[in-house]
Amino acid sequence: MQKSVFLAAVAGVGMTAGVASAATLDDVQARGTLNCGVNTGLVGFAAPNAEGEWEGFDVAVCKAVAAAVLGDPSAVEYVSLTGKTRFTALASGEIDMLSRNTTQTFTRDVDLKFEFTGINYYDGQGFMVPAELGVSSATELDGATICIQTGTTTELNLADYFRSNNMDYEPVPIETNA
């Protein structure tokens, strides 16, 4: 069953959405709530505030869809998802839509059969290095230990960068950025 897809990107390209199948819309309307997959906590995009209420850009997208489909922007159940769990949750029906940082790729479009919409957020990737190390170029990072969020295109881009520059690195995988 095809699901509506809203994928907001922080690591690459942007917000993507598919046209919801009639069955998904029927399910949402019958349930009276939209199950919206969001990041596990990315301030400015999707994170609970001090009162425990979700806020941010991706949250606003979920609210807009709930308002359009159900007439109530508060009729949203937020489901925290990691880079590794987001696509399984969408494909399995655990969520009705996904609104979280996700890069649109050919493989995700073709193999996962998600329909992406226009990009809503552009970003970039880089390295943060303590100033006292005196590093002025990423090419000086041969042998570095680098934290990287798993299940992301950033993880793949990091491996590609080091491989193409004949450099080694020690990845420190992290599940979430929270």
Model regions and ranges:
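Short loop->beta-strand "edge-of-pocket" segments that line small-molecule binding or catalytic clefts
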Residues: 33-39, 55, 139-155
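Short coil/turn segments
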Residues: 41, 103-104, 130-134, 146-154
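Second-shell loop/turn segments in exported
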Residues: 47-53, 76, 86, 143-148
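Short hydrophobic/charged patches on amphipathic alpha-helices used for structural packing
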Residues: 25-26, 87, 138, 178
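Acidic, polar ligand-binding/catalytic clefts
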Residues: 63, 67, 71, 75-140
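N-terminal hydrophobic or amphipathic helices and topogenic motifs
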Residues: 2-12, 20-74
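Soluble non-cytosolic domains of exported or imported proteins
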Residues: 52-60, 81-84, 148-153, 174-178
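Ligand-binding cleft/hinge of the Venus flytrap
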Residues: 50, 63-74, 116, 154-176
